[in-house]
């Protein structure tokens, strides 16, 4: 090693020594800075939204924020400048949607008009933005051939098997003709050992009396065939809306290819009627089911916001089986209006308990995509669900990422079974596929838990999912045990969702403490990442114990690394985050198809793998550059979400070890002696690394 390299090597280690000495003196942690409230903005903390640059399609609609949200003022301004006021994007909010009928409905160029410029400068206009049509993809993958007969409607699989809606087959408990084929709900029925069963254990939840009654679920998709006889008794018009055509009827648009079948398929998985001699049984077969038609048209920020924010005080669970393109090169997420709708749903939905957003993790496996590049599944607000095949394998379409929370069954390779559900034209199908099929199964299971305990918050439910998910029988090479003894995988999250276990825990669950957020910045910027090399940055966190009470985090839930970096080819980068407990999360994998030179701008990579671990200690960010040229890390910050006190096995909180340690240090000398010992140990370890 050269002298220069040796000194540089020592310099990095000496920074840790300096850190230790500052800790001894009781100063704030070196290598981090507590953010003050004055730095708060609506750019990126919880939901990432910076998209890859691409050719944009501009619509003739504008989102306009009117001070006070007064409809009279919105109408006045729209009339004054020649717009049509289409009404509030979310009722009761300040954002309105204006349309300019003088312009083309779609254009590749952004409108630069005098009227738009003048409207923007009106005193009561706080913000306005021309709406862009986004590419959003349904997360099923397989096309099928359809046939009709004089009396029956059925679908044909590749091997020619037909599934009819006729009532000519009877099955006990229930008598729905396809119940015996619903392997993901009933094949573990005769296995008393819950650790070996390979289904979602819904029968146990049903036997306990939980069927989703009183819980409202809505499907955000391409429509809902509300007249389907296996759905209509549970259809709820208050949980439904047509955002595309701006009316109250979510019926899909019928066409020859039946492309708009997706929402109806998802809805049947949740709430198809029990024991009516038709098709299938929904997991939450007594739940109210609604549909938001929003994918059959231009999907803009306003469309997404109106969908995820629809009737948030009434709807309990929103299920979404779509997202940005799973092509291995897209980086995209919700924009300003949708971020606001998510945050409002979490804070105010369900009368303050928080809306439940269930999201399909994505089908980009064949293109080596990462669901951490999807700002919807990568959000702390969504319950991101992956898929497993009937044999417990990773499906070929599955995306691995650290934001996935849990798994449900879906389709797999040729010869492996798929998901059965309702279909258009009052039909049934055995060919629902991909993570599209996984998210509604999860939504149905969550509905059972909500019936067992309607007072659960959105975070309570995530805690319950993590504590009850089963890793047994799911095959992945990356299963690891985190710092609190829970098994977790990038492909399966914490494992297979277990309906029986969830309702039993939900019944006795005590509400967790309010969520705290600790933001800490890496102190220096513009770190070079040479090609073929790894950049490693160490950031010590004290859980923000030197700041305001609402920022103190002792036990983590979600963790984010918010990263801004430049790269000649974004897909050549890999990013890892290691916690003080030693749990290593893969935040970003190589994506060969991602040739973008845009890098990342304030992109919030999220991991759930540290759930329950202690926040305080050394966090390590590593960035591998396998490209042909240097990359550069501009900045990064660590965001820890969690609580000041430990969450118990049945909810509720225990005292924080950091708080106890703080009291001991103030009251006795033993606490100080412990800190001195801790610092001396750190110094010795540091110098040993230098000498090595």
From Swiss-Prot:
Propeptide, residue positions: 34-139
Q: What happens when the gene is disrupted?
A: Several defects in neuron development. In PVD mechanosensory neurons, tertiary and quaternary branching is decreased, secondary and ectopic tertiary branching is increased, the length of dendritic branches is also reduced and branches tend to overlap. Secondary dendrite branches are trapped next to primary branches. In a sax-7 (nj48) or dma-1 (wy686) mutant background, significantly less secondary dendrites are trapped. Increased dma-1 protein levels in PVD neuron dendrites.
- State a single Gene Ontology molecular function: serine-type endopeptidase activity
Q: List the disulfide bonds.
A: 279-428, 371-401, 518-544
Q: Does Magnesium show up as a keyword for this record?
A: no
This chain belongs to the protein called Furin-like protease kpc-1
Q: Which residues lie on this side of the membrane: Lumenal?
A: 140-670
Q: Where is this region: Disordered?
A: 152-177, 230-249
* Entry EC number(s): 3.4.21.-
Quaternary structure note: Interacts (via extracellular domain) with receptor dma-1 (via extracellular domain); the interaction promotes dma-1 internalization.
Binding residues annotated for Ca(2+) 1, in chain numbering: 176, 230, 273, 276, 278, 280
The annotated active site, in chain numbering, is: 221, 262, 436
Required cofactor(s): Ca(2+)
Q: What's in the keyword line of the UniProt record?
A: Calcium, Cell membrane, Cell projection, Cleavage on pair of basic residues, Disulfide bond, Glycoprotein, Hydrolase, Membrane, Metal-binding, Protease, Serine protease, Signal, Transmembrane, Transmembrane helix, Zymogen
């Amino acid at each position: 090693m050269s002298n220069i390299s040796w000194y540089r090597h020592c310099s990095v280690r000496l920074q840790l020594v300096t850190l230790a000495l500052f800790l001894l003196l009781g100063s704030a942690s070196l290598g981090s800075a507590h953010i003050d409230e004055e730095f708060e903005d609506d750019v990126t903390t919880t939901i990432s939204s910076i998209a890859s640059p691409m050719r944009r399609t501009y619509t003739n609609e504008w989102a306009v924020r009117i001070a006070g949200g007064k409809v009279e003022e919105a109408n006045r301004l729209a009339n004054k400048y020649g717009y049509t006021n289409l009404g509030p994007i979310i009722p009761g909010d300040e954002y309105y949607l204006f349309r300019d009928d003088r312009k083309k409905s779609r254009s590749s160029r952004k409108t630069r008009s005098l009227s738009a410029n003048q409207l923007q400068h009106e005193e009561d206009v706080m913000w306005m933005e021309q709406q862009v049509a986004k590419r959003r993809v349904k997360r099923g993958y397989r096309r099928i051939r359809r046939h009709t007969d004089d009396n029956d409607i059925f679908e044909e699989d590749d091997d020619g098997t037909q599934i009819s809606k006729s009532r000519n087959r009877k099955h006990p408990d229930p008598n729905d003709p396809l119940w015996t084929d619903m392997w993901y709900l009933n094949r573990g029925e005769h296995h008393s050992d819950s650790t070996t069963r390979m289904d979602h254990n819904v029968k146990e939840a049903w036997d306990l009396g939980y069927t989703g009654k009183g819980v409202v679920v809505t499907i955000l998709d391409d429509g809902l065939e509300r007249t389907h006889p296996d759905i209509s008794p549970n259809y709820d018009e208050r949980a439904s809306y047509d955002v595309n055509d701006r009316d109250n009827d979510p019926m899909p648009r019928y066409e020859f290819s039946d492309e708009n079948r997706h929402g109806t398929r998802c809805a049947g998985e949740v709430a198809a009627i029990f024991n009516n001699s038709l098709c299938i049984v929904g997991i939450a077969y007594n739940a109210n089911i609604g549909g938001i038609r929003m994918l059959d048209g231009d999907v803009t920020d306003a469309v997404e916001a109106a969908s995820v924010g629809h009737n948030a005080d009434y709807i309990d669970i929103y299920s979404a089986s779509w997202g940005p393109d799973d092509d291995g090169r897209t980086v995209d997420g919700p924009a300003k209006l949708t971020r606001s709708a998510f945050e409002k749903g979490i804070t105010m939905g369900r009368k303050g308990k928080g809306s439940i957003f269930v999201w399909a993790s994505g089908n980009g496996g064949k293109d080596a995509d990462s669901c951490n590049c999807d700002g919807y599944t990568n959000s702390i607000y969504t319950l991101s669900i992956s898929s497993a095949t009937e044999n417990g394998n990773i499906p070929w379409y599955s995306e691995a990422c650290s934001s996935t929370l849990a798994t449900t069954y879906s389709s797999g390779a040729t010869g492996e079974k798929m998901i059965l559900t309702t279909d258009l034209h009052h039909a049934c199908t055995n060919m629902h596929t991909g993570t599209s099929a996984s998210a509604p199964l999860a939504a149905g299971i969550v509905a059972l838990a909500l019936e067992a305990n309607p007072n659960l918050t959105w975070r309570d439910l995530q805690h319950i999912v993590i504590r009850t998910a089963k890793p047994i029988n799911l095959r992945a090479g990356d299963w690891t045990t985190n710092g609190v003894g829970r098994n977790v995988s990038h492909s399966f999250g914490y494992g297979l969702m277990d309906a029986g276990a969830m309702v039993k825990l939900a019944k006795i669950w005590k509400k967790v403490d309010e969520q705290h957020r600790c933001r800490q910045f890496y102190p220096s910027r513009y770190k070079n990442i040479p090609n073929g090399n790894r950049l490693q940055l160490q950031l010590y966190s004290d859980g923000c114990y030197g700041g305001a009470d609402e920022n103190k985090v002792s036990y983590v839930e979600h963790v984010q690394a918010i990263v801004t970096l430049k790269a000649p080819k974004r897909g050549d980068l890999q990013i890892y985050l290691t916690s003080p407990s030693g749990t290593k999360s893969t935040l970003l994998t190589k994506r060969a198809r991602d040739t973008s030179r845009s890098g990342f701008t304030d992109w919030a990579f999220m991991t759930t793998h540290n759930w329950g671990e202690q926040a305080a200690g050394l966090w390590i960010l590593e960035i591998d550059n396998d490209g042909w040229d240097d990359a550069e890390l501009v900045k990064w910050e660590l965001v820890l979400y969690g609580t000041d006190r430990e969450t118990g096995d049945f909810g509720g909180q225990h005292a924080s070890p950091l708080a106890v340690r703080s009291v001991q240090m103030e009251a006795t000398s033993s606490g100080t002696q412990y800190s001195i010992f801790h610092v001396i140990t750190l110094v010795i370890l540091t110098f040993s690394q230098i000498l090595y």
